[in-house]
Amino acid sequence: MIVMNGRELTQGHFPDGTLSFKLPEDLVWDEEGQIIEWKYESDAELFSLICLKRWIDEHMTTKVWLVLRYLPHARMDRTEEFFDVFTLKYFCQVINDLNFTQVCVLDPHSNVSIALLDRVVVAPPDNLIREALDRSDAEIVCFPDQGALKRYGKMIDNRIAVYCQKRRDWATGKILGLDLIDPSDDVKGRRILIVDDISSRGGTFYYTANKLLEAGAAQVSLYVTHCEDTIYQGEFYNDLVKTGAVKKVYTTQSLLKEVKPGIEIVIHNPNKDSQ
């Protein structure tokens, strides 16, 4: 989905599958500059973005900010074998070539992407996490691994934090379980918010939430900045969220297409001043 100055821009296709794209004649143009928001759904939208930016460059002189809350291709932030294609690198090269005034990304999964993007501004999720803490009335924050602890540990004010350590089958990468690291006694009878950057099927959070509930937590909720719709296919949503064992999942509007019961959106609002 591509939105400019708060208005969704629709695209169609000709019978041969090529792009049909016309801007609304009553589209509002901002004298200070234009904000394009790309809510990533597929790489096909990249061509629409290219065409839109080229059209603006040809027809007017204006600043253009790109808000790309979820930065795609972060999973491919390195190559290990000769025939691996470094998709993140080439994606960032295309964005750089469009010469946006600035590119705003929200809580990117990989720091490699930040090094590859020009004129990039990283929007931290601290205010979003605080809002999720307020909504959930959480007393304690749980980080599902040390990476999340290092990433978000300074964003939780004075709340008590606990973290987990995953146990994996290193041959397959599959999570076998996890251990709650001391002070696990703080969990009993408390309201807890799990905090991390992204969820796919939610396997990590399935094990984390179960461990917290086993330790006597009174309430468990989850905050992730980015959430894929595949969360609805996993045990975490179907066994824990739908049954009420996990109270809520809080996420931003960056990626999730369908909001089902148990999911709440925490809105990230971009503006030119913060970029």
Q: What is the predicted role of each segment?
A:
Residues 1-275:
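PRPP-associated nucleotide enzymes
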